[in-house]
A protein has these predicted regions:
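N-terminal Rossmann-like dinucleotide/flavin-binding domain of flavoprotein oxidoreductases
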Residues: 2-9, 26, 46-137, 217-243, ...
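FAD-site-proximal beta/loop scaffold in flavoenzymes
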Residues: 161-178, 265, 269-354
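Short hydrophobic core segments
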Residues: 12-14, 118, 138-149, 183-184, ...
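Flexible, glycine-rich terminal cap/loop adjacent to redox cofactors
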Residues: 14-40, 52, 56, 60, ...
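A Rossmann-like FAD-binding core segment of flavoenzymes
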Residues: 76-77, 112-115, 119-132, 200-300, ...
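Beta1/beta-strand and adjacent pyrophosphate-binding region of the FAD-binding site
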Residues: 4-17, 177-187
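Glycine-rich Rossmann-fold phosphate-binding loop(s) that bind the pyrophosphate
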Residues: 15-18, 39-40, 184-187, 217, ...
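Rossmann-like dinucleotide-binding cores of NAD(P)H-dependent redox enzymes
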Residues: 92-99, 172-173, 178-182, 188-249, ...
C-alpha cells in the first residue's frame, strides 16, 4: 500500500490485548467497521507474559502443597515437582507464544488487524509503522481507543542494563529454574512469583521497602501469605531495599546485591517487581495535546477528559483506574457500548450502574492473588473505608471453622471479612484468605454490585459442606454483633 493512502474505519483500536479485543468486539457487533493495531502478539500481556503463564506456573505448586499436607495423601507425594513438565505446561497455556488462534478469532469477528507500531497523528488519525518498514495510515469516523496497557516500571538502580534484571515477562517465560532468585517488590507479582519459583525449586529471597507484603489488601490476608512463604523457605527482608546490585560476569554471572540494612546477597537472577508504567511514551499523544508517557485520565465512559470531542478513549490499565485484566475487559464492554451509542446519536445512560458508566471501577473491583493461601477481595478494605471517612461494620470469621473448609484441608488456615454499610445494610467490601477462596469471590461481587440487602442474603442458602458456608457464618456473626 502507498504511504499516501488512508484506510477509513468507524473505529480504530490501538492495542490487541484482551481490552482492545473486547472494545473491537463490541463495536464490530454493533455494526461499526473496526480495525485493531498490534505491535507484538495478538492477545497481549495477559495471554503470553502475565495472567496465563503465571497461573500455569502456580497451579502445580499450590496443588502439590495442598496434597502434601492432606492426611493419607502426603505420604504418596514424594520428591520435588517435575519442573520441566511444569514449564512445558506453562508453554502450552501461553500458546507457545504464537497468536494464530487469536488472529483467527479476529478474522471470524470481522475485525481487521494491522500489525505494527501505532501512533496518533492528530484527531481521529493513526499512523502504523509496520515490521516490514512500511506505513499504514488509518482514520476513524467516530473514535480511537487507546488500549496499550502497561510495562514494568524499573527502579533507578545504577548499571541497570548490565544487570539484565528480570521483569514480570522474564519471570513468567523463563526456560529453566534459577538456583537462586532475588525479588524486589511487595506486590502481587512479587509474591506470586516467589510462590511459583520457590515451589519449582529455586532458593528465593524477597526484598521489600514496605514493612509488610501486599499493602493494598487486608493486613490479615497479607500476614497469612507471609507466614506461608516463610514456611516454604522464602527469605523475607522487609523494610529495606537494594542499595546496589551488580552482575559479576564471568562463569557464574551471579548478581551481587547490597541492601540498605547492610545485608549482602548473591542471586542468579534478580526480578524487579516494582510496579507498572503506562505504555504511552511513543503513541503520538503530543499530536493531540497530551504529554507522552503519562496515564490517560478518563471519565466514567472512558473518554479522555483532556481531549475535546469525545473521540479519544483510554481503556484498561492505561487509564490507571484498575490495573487488572478482567476489570479492563469490563471497561472495554462499557467503552464499546458508549462508542456505539454515540455513533448512533443515542442518549447515554451514565447514571450510577448505568449501561454507559464504569461504576464497578469505583465500587466493586475484584482481585485474586494466587498464593498459598489464595486471597480474594472485592470492594473496600478497612483501610479504604478509613481513608474515605466511611463508617462500616466489620465482620470477621475464621474460615477453618466451616465444615467445608475442614473437608478441604483438616488443617485449613483462612479468614474472611466483610464490611457492611450500617445505614444501607449492604456489603461494601469483602476479603477472603484461604485455599479455594477464589471461587467465593463472584458471589461477593454480585452482592456488592447488586446492593443486595443483608436481610435478603439470609435467603441465599450455601450448600453443605462447602467453603461457601462461610457466608452463613458471617451473617450469623453480624447478627450477634448487633444484639
Amino acid at each position: 500500500m502507498s504511504d499516501n493512502e488512508t484506510r477509513i474505519y468507524d473505529i480504530v483500536v490501538i492495542g490487541a490485548g484482551p481490552v482492545g479485543e473486547n472494545v473491537a468486539d463490541r463495536t464490530r457487533a454493533a455494526g461499526l467497521s473496526t480495525v485493531i493495531v498490534e505491535s507484538e502478539l495478538v492477545g497481549g500481556e495477559c495471554s503470553y507474559w502475565a495472567c496465563e503463564p503465571s497461573k500455569a506456573l502456580l497451579r502445580p505448586v499450590l496443588l502439590y502443597g495442598e496434597a502434601a499436607r492432606f492426611p493419607g495423601v502426603g505420604g504418596a507425594v514424594t520428591g520435588p515437582l517435575d519442573a520441566e513438565a511444569v514449564l512445558k505446561h506453562r508453554d502450552r497455556m501461553s500458546a507457545d507464544w504464537n497468536d494464530r488462534d487469536q488472529v483467527d478469532w479476529l478474522d471470524s469477528a470481522r475485525i481487521d488487524l494491522v500489525r505494527g507500531h501505532g501512533r496518533l497523528d492528530g484527531p481521529r488519525r493513526v499512523t502504523v509503522h509496520t515490521p516490514e518498514g512500511g506505513i499504514v495510515r488509518l482514520a476513524a469516523r467516530h473514535a480511537v481507543a487507546v488500549c496499550t496497557g502497561t510495562s514494568a516500571a524499573l527502579p533507578p538502580l545504577p548499571g541497570l542494563d548490565a544487570l539484565r534484571p528480570w521483569t514480570s515477562r522474564e519471570a513468567t517465560s523463563a526456560r529453566e529454574v534459577p538456583d537462586r532468585l532475588a525479588i524486589l517488590g511487595a506486590g502481587v507479582v512479587a509474591v506470586e512469583m516467589a510462590t511459583a519459583w520457590r515451589g519449582l525449586g529455586a532458593q528465593v529471597t524477597l526484598i521489600a521497602r514496605e514493612s509488610r507484603l501486599l499493602g493494598r489488601v487486608e493486613a490479615f490476608a497479607a500476614d497469612l501469605v507471609a507466614d506461608r512463604l516463610r514456611e516454604a523457605g522464602v527469605t523475607l527482608h522487609l523494610g529495606t531495599t537494594i542499595d546496589t546490585a551488580e552482575r559479576a560476569g564471568g562463569p557464574d554471572d551471579a548478581v551481587h546485591i547490597s541492601l540498605a540494612d547492610g545485608t549482602r546477597l548473591v542471586a542468579d537472577e534478580l526480578l524487579l517487581a516494582t510496579g507498572r508504567a503506562p505504555r504511552t511514551e511513543d503513541i503520538g499523544l503530543e499530536t493531540v495535546g497530551l504529554t507522552p508517557g503519562e496515564w490517560l485520565g478518563v471519565d466514567d465512559s472512558y473518554a479522555v477528559t483532556a481531549v475535546d470531542g469525545e473521540w479519544l478513549y483510554a481503556v484498561g490499565d492505561v487509564n490507571r483506574r484498575a490495573l487488572l485484566t478482567h476489570q479492563g475487559k469490563y471497561q472495554a464492554r462499557i467503552a464499546g457500548a458508549v462508542i456505539a451509542a454515540r455513533a448512533r446519536g443515542l442518549t447515554l445512560d451514565t447514571g450510577r450502574w448505568g449501561a454507559h458508566a464504569g461504576t464497578a471501577d469505583l465500587e466493586a473491583v475484584p482481585q485474586v492473588v494466587f498464593t498459598d493461601p489464595e486471597i480474594a477481595a472485592v470492594g473496600l478494605t478497612t483501610e479504604d473505608a478509613a481513608r474515605a471517612g466511611r463508617v462500616v461494620d466489620v465482620v470477621d470469621y475464621e474460615i477453618g471453622r466451616v465444615a467445608g473448609a475442614i473437608q478441604h484441608d483438616p488443617g485449613y488456615r483462612g479468614h474472611a471479612r466483610v464490611l457492611i454499610d450500617p445505614e444501607r445494610r449492604v456489603i461494601v467490601g469483602a476479603t477472603f484468605a484461604g485455599a479455594g477462596v477464589a471461587e467465593l469471590l463472584h458471589s461477593a461481587a454480585i452482592a456488592i454490585a447488586g446492593e443486595v440487602p443483608i436481610d435478603r442474603l439470609w435467603h441465599a442458602v450455601p450448600s453443605f459442606p462447602t467453603i461457601s458456608e462461610v457466608w452463613l457464618r458471617l451473617l450469623e456473626t453480624y447478627r450477634d454483633q448487633r444484639v
